[in-house]
Amino acid sequence: MDRELLHSGGFLNARVYVARGEDGRKRIEKDFSECPWLVRNTLGRFLVWRETWMLRRLGGVTKAVPGGVVRLSAFALAEDFVDGPSMRETYFRASREGLKAASGKIFPHEFFDRFDAGISEIHAAGFVHLDLHNARNVMVAPGWRPVFVDWQSALPTRFMPGFLRRALERIDEAGALKFRAKFRPMDVSAGDRRRLDRANFFRRHFWLPRLRIGEAKSGSGLSG
């Protein structure tokens, strides 16, 4: 199997590869095996187990997560390659062609309907993603299907108190609403904007910034 390095990783970060099998199919591989011994045997083992467990649970209930997840070793996992750009890349490509974000021509309304449906399915299964306000974490698969990647901030919610679970779910919902307001403002009501303001207030003042571990990234997220 051929592998191309996508992200070089680091002290706390997995190396990320695009691998191509003999059948020509591509997949993403995240590998902690080259991290220092203590990191790979503690954080690395935990993050590999955790992401594999979550994506396997979610793979049976929604198409909004990467499929085909397998645990390659105690320190590595693989998942299906999403054949499409991120929302961030889609926007930048369209802006270079002269399209304005608020024109309504970059993303169809069906994309955001599927975005909302995917979030609802994830929440019903007992999970929250918590980083869907970052346009790099939403891939645009063929047919305008959103796929949510980078699950290192995600949490299971099944045993949380109801008020906390709902507050965290609103963070995910606000991510979808943020992008709908940016790219299709004609579809957003005054009530939607008030909900977005409330969710952003909670995220900024009561939710600690996430610790970026487990996967190296480059560039900045699409600002709202």
Give residue spans per PLM region:
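ATP-binding glycine-rich loop module of kinase domains
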Residues: D2-T52, R56
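Conserved hydrophobic "DFG−1" position in protein kinase catalytic cores
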Residues: V18-A19, D31, D80-F81, E89, ...
